[in-house]
């Protein structure tokens, strides 16, 4: 029975005026909710209080021994496996039974951030810190120049996931803070890796060709560009950089917002205590010890200092703003009036030929139809945004959201005193000329404490047909699910949250990233391991919509790679569309009841036809067997 008449027509996009580039957008401010189950949760590392709404937590698993106390980072998925990055390496889980994830392999190979992606039998891992070694050793590297250092992409063969084989690496001048994997629909022989490096440029003595000079002084500068690696699938050991696109050309320094009054007071108190306070481009934040320690170790190592004196520590303190500025994309000297010199994340959507670049002070829309030569289609800036961090398209590519990692992820930015437009998401429509138009902001609607690092972070679309549903991490703000079908009116429809890791001081924790994969939602918890959730019916989401979403099956999924969700024909899909018609009051109750009755009848007839067909086949088999 054909059920095409059940499909809802595409949503009409309203005609809007594009805001002036760089201006703070006009928007009716979102209000913070002051009565919510997430407020006042008990603190604790593995025993914190929890609040959950319209979700069911099906599992939580702790990291293996060598990874406890070390930051868990991003996730990738292949078949029944979850690959979890960690600053100490990669953890591989078998989630054939999502309620009981089983540890398959903990591969010790330290490097920050160890963001991961997969394709076929290949695993790619980012390395950026100066302590990462080519041999995966745990002793680190103290020398300022070393040919044992890994800063770039590691490549593993995972034909046997229980025994990954390190087969190659591609070194880059600024390391790989994150990376994105691109499978071109028209190329089955190669894949491409877009590398976003945020570290200072390494010396040419360590990697020939690296230059940290301004492009005006050196056209081959490693600044103001990304790297594209081509990976031949029949010989991944030949992977190499094939281009370094300068997608930031002609961008000027974006507008910035300064600190709030509460922050100014907080910074002065922190300075008096001897803590590290840095100001980058008008944005201020206090660096947690978990950030300071590796930076100081790298600084002293590059200076050849094994036992720092008080004078050495003071020199590091003075150098820190410049170190952070290079990491966060700040200009220097002749380039201080230029725009960003790097991207943080680039979300690739090959099936529509577009990418969303979250590039420090700008959000970019890129054409990736030629994977080795992406180019910029549009750019937006906003003084409410401090650090454009990640991007997500809706399924048809008509909308895009960007996240703002105000403060770098290491500070509490979801307090009652923090503006709701800062550290939030910004939503845009994309017109036929591939220009982006601002619509609204959304931020976690409940206040978090001073002891909880909280700001907008990574997430993914959930394939509910006919709607744009997004699950997102907010560090210690937990995970939140929102409906952004109408980008001017984003609504929270589910959440999970824990209390702070500590109620005495700010300690890093919370959800680094969260993604939907084949019917379940997986969250990489920075300090606590891996959480697994499933959707439950609510006033915002029906059982039929959830069932239809779960008919979508992926062979693999990567954090910065966005697939087109496609729904196979099913009665769940038909019923989901009818539920949406009812919710949107597109038909009266009698009409809705009539359609549902016809679907029920069609399913019964279809089921009976299948049963009758099987019975006839069994009868034929019996008859042939008796002969």
Regions found by a protein language model. Name each.
Residues 1, 15, 613-614:
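Intrinsically disordered, low-complexity regions enriched in serine, threonine, proline
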Residues 1-7:
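Bacterial N-terminal signal peptides that target proteins for export
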